[in-house]
Amino acid sequence: MYTIDISLRGTPLGLSVQRKESADAEALYQQVLAAIKSGNPTILEMTCDREPDKKAAVLVNEITAVQLSDKSGGAGAGRAAGFFELGA
């Protein structure tokens, strides 16, 4: 399972959606990246492969970061979820 994490301006919690296939995850990552680069204040709608009923709509100019990661290893893969990990 591949996860696309999105950080939003002024919001401490991020938004995540999952894709089963690497190519699908890369396509969504590139779509979000292109939307950010366009600078247009449009809405980006996303769905989640892991939770088919999960839908999200985001105002593109509020996105501050996007990350694509392989979560097939689960939480025990030795690293924290999200963008940053503080050393112990």
UniProtKB/Swiss-Prot annotation:
InterPro entries registered for this protein in UniProt: UPF0367
Similarity comment: Belongs to the UPF0367 family.
Protein name from the UniProt record: UPF0367 protein AM1_1885
Species in which this protein is naturally found: Acaryochloris marina (strain MBIC 11017)
Upper classification of the organism: Bacteria, Bacillati, Cyanobacteriota, Cyanophyceae, Acaryochloridales
